């Protein structure tokens, strides 16, 4: 595939986007006004095709210079293509700081330094005596318990040092943060400050005093507090310049102790530095018991002692190797696009920088490598190395006094030691986050190894927000409920270690609990904790419950997702007690067919949509049982969109069962056709050619049982007819089946004669099905309708050579040549290509059970926007199929919800002008063939449709988009998808609930010039509307199943018939838009040329009136008469015709 760079965003930690240059006009821009939407539909497409560069012969054959030869050699060695090199260089140019901005930042840093060292000192007081603090500033730390020993005085910092990525040249836009370490004078600190948060209290008081004085300085436009990497014990002070440079940079001040002040041996992961008697007012478990270790607390102290040494290490390795710096910058972009560096416990840019240093030290990366090679090497390492099992270390020392890796593994989920051997750099990274990093690295390596043309774009330019990357998400709120979870899970040591942060304390145990419970249903569980927002220095720091929402993402495994049974051990095994303890009251003894008696859990789920939501039952049950988190605190987002494709009667089903029943009935009919006796030629193939038979019909049919009293009966044809005094009967669409007959010399060679023979076969087919199987049939010259088990099938007899016969053209000299005609192309599409497509998509559904739901939601949305008739049904099915066959950079969707979001993203960002959409069914197209097809596409672009979809069976012509959409309709769809996607994602990620999920399905009616409102009485699919009516009309169907001997009314849809008449009569003046699924409104847009005066012609006065302008007779639309004709044509169906005259003038 080849998505356009349009609408893509590189998001920083604060979520502010830096929009890359758009390539497709009008894409991804929110807040489009109605007038712009109207222009989109009405105006011709903008010129935007990529044109080949033409060179003169001399330029084409000019010898390369030495510089060009060197560059080519470098490209061959360091990159796998020159295109990739250009893309990498352009991206780095985009995210790097310019020299001008660096100079302005340097100047600001010098000003900050001068002001910090001039802050006045404060005399010594007790730590608990904070009366000296001015009224306008609050201590940025929760002082619980408040009582703590020690004294504090303020002295200006002994040293001010810039640390972090700014000096290294690896920081990336748009959010430039410069970290500054303030070394506190030794006189402020005391020997036992490592105990009971004393150091952290002093650190916070130091910042509070600084904040008070710096806030009064006119240099700063903003002075506020923030948490360092989300750690609530380690606030930092943020400074931003005043005026035009306000967004240029954020300087973060980090107080730290003097070098070697804290002894590392006291801060080992096995040591305790928060006494239970101080923190809880009691010893841990009675007299004489050991204090629990506080590894995370110890790590947070240690982190402040190594800021400068880490900078020196990074500088030594990176400073002389531009390729390493480029690699770090690319890795930071990679993390940012996947939101892996956000919030507490994120996999930060600092960690990947240190990982590069580790790989250099172990000779897995060489300093001469390019940024792309560094990126590949790091991703390869992450994909194949599990730091939760085998930690790594930068420490080269063999000192026996150093702690062992095993000690760190016992204390932390992920282990990566720094060069001192005392500090775990990944102390804050949870196992879930690291496994997510591993998962993303594996996907990225597969993408890079495929060498796809758009691999760079998918890897580094495509955002992967949680709601679009995971099948289901769940929000836990309020966070204060996690306090109860800590009590239930007995997490007192963890609370003590985390300084009371019950969210961090409970996070690991909760994710482990859910991973165990979801088992084979789960591929990956990830969590997202949004960064705690900054706060004003005059405010108290945010409480733990105010730190946003804890959101968990579930990447599901389709193989085990829909199983209703959790099978436990046999009753007499010792593991049975553990199983019962884990599942609680849901576990029960069951006897199975093999005679075994086992513990088991059975979940309640009747329909496929309910089975997809079994993880919801698992999550809520386990959280309530083990963590005391009630269901009311768990907002699970897995199926809110299911309501849009739910059947009319089975409100709990999204139609999969009805589709399976229809396909099963089709299979039975196929067997009957294969076994028919008495046909002059045998059946060679029976193929489905209808959306139902590829599982993509939005509202699948159900068996029809007509109430005969509701209809008129046509006895001689055993058929029913609608009655004028009754509401419109239920809509019944026959399912097309193509029946191929064997070739024979008896077939005529004349096209008209072939059609007559086919008509005879249609009649004979009906006779034999009625005689041999008692089926109700109705034959015509082109098809035979068959009623079987309440379903209606339309069988079309096909002869394989007929398309070729239709292509034959005879010259006056008697020479026969083959030439495509409209009739031959249509017949080939309907009898060969459509059955092949239906068969391929049927197979895709067997492979990916979510395909049906995704395709149906996609079509439901397109039709709800009143644009359905601009797109062939098959074209939308293929776009949905592309999400499963080419899911990069994601995995194939396992839920309709995430698939629909990706559909909106694909539609709104794909570069339809310059790329064909590849849908490689059955993986038949090789990479070389795709390159060849792309070249042919660019060469013939002007002759191809605006939307080109390539499949293995349709490599050049894009059969399914030949008749639409137009450029204007496609652009309107792109605009609507770009507006709907962020709105829907915001709704689904709202922890209070998604609100009205149907909002994005409601069409924007304000863009239309005329609205024709229809009577629900004559809308047969009224109940399928986006806003389903509370009550509708009886449609003449019996609720109880039973045999039917009469053919129901087929394909009778008055709004569609009315639309056909409108287009025939007024298609030259206006465009008509309608939602076939129960829409009550037809939108009318006048064409731009409609109101231009036309020369008077007696032959074209329809809908126009004659006027005199400039002495000449001209014709202009007679709007009043046209609107009256709208109502007359639709008499009985049309309720009102609303002319929105403010939108147009004659």
Swiss-Prot record:
Quaternary state and interactors: Part of the small subunit (SSU) processome, composed of more than 70 proteins and the RNA chaperone small nucleolar RNA (snoRNA) U3. Interacts with RRP7A; required for NOL6 localization to nucleolus.
Stated role: Part of the small subunit (SSU) processome, first precursor of the small eukaryotic ribosomal subunit. During the assembly of the SSU processome in the nucleolus, many ribosome biogenesis factors, an RNA chaperone and ribosomal proteins associate with the nascent pre-rRNA and work in concert to generate RNA folding, modifications, rearrangements and cleavage as well as targeted degradation of pre-ribosomal RNA by the RNA exosome.
The name this protein goes by in its record: Nucleolar protein 6
Region of interest called Disordered, as start-end residue ranges on this chain: 1-48
Principal location: nucleus
Name of the encoding gene: NOL6
InterPro entries in the record: NOL6/Upt22, Nrap_D1, Nrap_D2, Nrap_D3, Nrap_D4, Nrap_D5, Nrap_D6
Pfam families referenced in this protein's UniProt entry, alphabetically: Nrap, Nrap_D2, Nrap_D3, Nrap_D4, Nrap_D5, Nrap_D6
Keywords from the named record: Chromosome, Coiled coil, Nucleus, Phosphoprotein, RNA-binding
